[in-house]
């Protein structure tokens, strides 16, 4: 499993906004601090605004801020928003059951791996990330 650039950047943006909280932060400032292009930053912000992780105010003096407290921004939820699924194999993330599930000797291992991954990321918040070096 590999987390996409979008997922990693979304987490960095949320940590940045949390660290520079209290007021509105211009998107260009976050982009400059995080080394993210303006175009890519706009895509990430649109996704985060849509799901309420970020609030945006347009116009003079506008900018962005967290849409909820950093301790309510769960890494697992954010990664599922940006990645779609944290399942390590396609058969666990599709709507239809895998035709080989009944005879597959590895499906149990993949399910457990997915459970461990979700439990791990669901136990971390943006506030926790602010404490790490």
Segments the model singles out, each with a brief description of its role:
Residues 53-66:
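Beta-hairpin "wing" of winged helix-turn-helix
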Residues 39:
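Key DNA-contact positions within bacterial/archaeal DNA-binding proteins
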Residues 45-46:
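Short, hydrophobic-biased segments on the C-terminal half of alpha helices
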Residues 32, 49-50:
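Alpha-helical residues within the helix-turn-helix
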Residues 67-133:
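Non-DNA-binding regulatory cores of transcription-related proteins
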Residues 50-53, 81:
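Residue cluster at the C-terminal edge of the helix-turn-helix DNA-binding motif
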Residues 3-5, 9-36, 55:
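N-terminal helix-turn-helix DNA-binding core of bacterial DNA-binding proteins
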